[in-house]
């Protein structure tokens, strides 16, 4: 309660009610509940001191990087070291509100036709590349036209690159066999099915999350073989099968999607980075053996940390001499609609942070 009211009264030029009114209401609310009644005086004292010393206290916080950027110190230090030219923009983007971006199901409707549907309802939206449409103002997804009919999914513009990247160059093959490892909740699985004709296995270690994949596919009118299993143990689910294309959206720190999951920066510990990098490396090694010669593997994470991106790619190429690195975006830093964007078609310049590396297996 104390933190909530402090946030409300922090900026005296941007509050809807008189600050003292908000303080009084907070104190009365604390008194009204047995579990907070004894803290009412403490809450009152803290808030009133803040109002008396607002300028000085805010000045103090501006001198502390953790308070200024709302990130833990180790995270700030890592971003500074890895992105010395643009670390401020990365941290600032994490503190912005993420847009509501849709991916149109092209098996059901075109982007142009869906924009017309939104226009009829006075919903302001724009095309942002590929099958992506961004709403100017977020609203309930189920209230949008065509949700129950499977016309669209919610997916960030950067995440929408995965399926086209993987399928480019292999779509022409007949009897195409594709694996989506670590597939839940199913957004990329669905996108793969929307843009190609393939026999697809969607794999995830979590049975409950696999149910979400099935629900997603059912709403969109798509089908895949959904399996519960550990991608690191293919002997339990693979049945000796090899794949023409593999998408490994690996477990990661989620350091690229902080604006969608603000708590992740405080839940993560610095020690998580090498631990997750080890898991990513193991998954890459195991799944590489399940790729046919000439096949493609797309490695992706929603992370901006180099250990989970370029560092992983360099180590993989050094270990697997039959791996050839293909053209892919690499690190996409989170962007909040300002300046240049590494997504050429994304006119909004508003997307999460991601990493993509595309490998093909040499046939020699």
Language-model segment annotations:
Residues 1-364:
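S-adenosylmethionine
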């Amino acid at each position: 309660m104390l933190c909530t009211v402090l946030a409300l009264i922090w900026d005296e030029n941007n509050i809807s009610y008189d600050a003292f009114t908000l303080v009084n209401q907070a104190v009365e609310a604390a008194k009204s509940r047995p579990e907070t009644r004894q803290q009412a005086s403490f809450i009152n004292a803290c808030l009133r001191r803040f109002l008396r010393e607002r300028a000085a206290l805010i000045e103090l916080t501006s001198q502390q990087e953790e308070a200024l950027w709302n990130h833990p110190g180790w995270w700030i230090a890592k971003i500074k070291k890895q992105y010395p030219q643009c670390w401020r923009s990365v941290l600032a983007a994490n503190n912005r509100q993420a847009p509501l971006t849709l991916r149109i199901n092209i098996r059901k409707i075109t982007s142009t036709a869906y924009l017309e549907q939104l226009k009829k309802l006075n919903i302001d939206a724009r095309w942002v590349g590929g099958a992506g449409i961004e709403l100017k103002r977020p609203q309930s997804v189920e209230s949008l036209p065509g949700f129950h009919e499977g016309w669209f999914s919610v997916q960030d513009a950067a995440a929408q690159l995965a399926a086209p990247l993987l399928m480019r160059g292999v779509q022409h093959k007949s009897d195409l066999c594709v694996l989506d490892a670590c597939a839940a909740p199913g957004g990329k699985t669905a996108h793969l099915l929307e843009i190609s004709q393939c026999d697809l296995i969607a794999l995830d270690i979590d049975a409950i999350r696999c149910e979400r994949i099935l629900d997603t596919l059912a709403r969109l009118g798509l089908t895949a073989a959904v399996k519960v299993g550990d991608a690191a143990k293919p002997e339990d689910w693979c049945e000796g099968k090899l794949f023409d294309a593999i998408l490994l959206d690996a477990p990661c720190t989620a350091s690229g999607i902080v604006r969608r999951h603000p708590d992740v920066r405080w839940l993560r510990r610095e020690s998580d980075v090498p631990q997750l990098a080890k898991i990513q490396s193991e998954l890459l090694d195991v799944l590489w053996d399940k790729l046919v010669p000439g096949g493609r593997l797309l490695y992706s994470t929603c992370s901006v940390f180099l250990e989970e991106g370029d560092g992983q790619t360099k180590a993989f190429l050094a270990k697997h001499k039959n791996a050839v690195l293909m053209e892919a975006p690499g690190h996409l830093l989170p962007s909040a609609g300002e300046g240049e964007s590494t997504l050429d078609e994304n006119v909004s310049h508003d997307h999460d942070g991601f990493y993509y590396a595309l490998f093909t297996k040499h046939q020699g």
